[in-house]
Amino acid sequence: MHEFNHEQQHIYELLLKKYNVIVEAVAGTGKTTTVLGYAAKQPNKKILQVTYNKALRKDVQDNAAENDIQNIQVHTFHSLAKKYYLRSGYTDKEIRKALHNNEVPMKPIQEFEMLVIDEVQDMTPLYYQLMVKFITDYGRPIQMLILGDKKQSLYDFKGSDERFLTKAAAIWEPLPFLTAPFRRAEMHISYRITKPMAEFVNKTLLGEERMEAVREGKPVDYVCHSPYNINNIIQYEIKNALDNGYSPGDIFILAASIKGKNKQFQK
């Protein structure tokens, strides 16, 4: 595993002090590296990580296997429900039914000491209720690590709510098996993008210095303009590129739509 940067080290030290930790982490900051790094440094600590989808689950499992980390089990909300509560199906409907019937676990819950919930900005009230039931049924004190990014909420249409991240302490503190105080931490250092990309995102999309990059990269040229004049702006930029030696094959246009009012893009 890579050595921790100062942000990751701070989270590690908070966890060593037995705090429950809430982490606001921008894209590419190494959340998985942080969790697995902690697991590697604390091999006797049994960890359960719950994340939103199968792809994220597989990524953590593959990284754990690659680094011979054996003290972490990884589930999605659905696979966790299936293992302990659902006799058939992986659907929200089945989870809702299990909660309504207050199903008891079908088998003893595998021991863990730390619960990691990732991508919490995508948590729905249903998944929150599932985790409350699961923690209550487990019935032993645990430590929590909550990870997410309020700017990456993708599933509002499914009922997700970023307040499960932004208000996490108030939401989780009432549970009797979370006895330690909550502390907040942030991760801003992204390994996924270059410094010019980070500058572009901060200035044009976020309006704040939220992302920090470590990789150098080519300068990013960008134009901020009213969308009502976008066709003329794009035509000007294309003509300028062609006049400066670029060929048509060097130019790629990405638009929200190329139909209807935006058909000028095709011209």
Regions found by a protein language model. Name each.
Residues P43, E66-D68, P108:
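Short hydrophobic "helix-edge" motifs at membrane interfaces and signal-peptide entry regions
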Residues H2-D62, H75-L80, M114, Q121-K267:
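Conserved helicase motor core of SF1/SF2 NTP-dependent helicases
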Residues D68, Y85, G89, N102-E103, ...:
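Short, flexible coil/linker elements and helix-boundary hinge sites characteristic
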Residues K83-E119, M123-F134:
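Conserved RecA-like ASCE ATPase "motif II neighborhood" in helicase/translocase motors
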Residues T51-H100:
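Inter-Walker segment of RecA-like/P-loop motor cores
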